[in-house]
Amino acid sequence: MNKAILIAVFALIPAAALADAHSELVTAEQHADYGAGSADIAGVHMHLHHTVNCLVGPGGNGFDAKELNPCAQSGNGAIPDSAADKRPALEAAAQKARDGIAAQDLATAKKKATEAHDMLHKLL
């Protein structure tokens, strides 16, 4: 098969088909863990924003374009890029992360980060 045909075929593949939901899940899980281990509320919130951004993707519930999206080059977010049967568990973990972002108490925010991490870890 000549090179031009291969390039044309790959150009027609939708971006979602090239998405790496597993990589997005791993990154979200890592950032939830970083949040759980943070020494201050700003650190917890920052890493939980990264977790949410990786899970929901741009335009998703809680996506914050002002915060880093460590999964920007991996796809459209773990939730939209995952199989339908995994989405409820991913949504539940994203909600824990959003709850942690909303918490103003360090202990509560860290608890929510730990819960999000544990939920995501089970999906790996």
Question: Where is each model-derived feature located?
Answer:
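Mature extracytoplasmic or organellar-lumen-exposed domains after removal of signal/transit peptides
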Residues: 19-124
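N-terminal signal peptide c-region/cleavage motif recognized by signal peptidases
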Residues: 9-18
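Sec-dependent signal peptide recognition
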Residues: 2-9
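Absolute protein N-terminus
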Residues: 1, 17-20
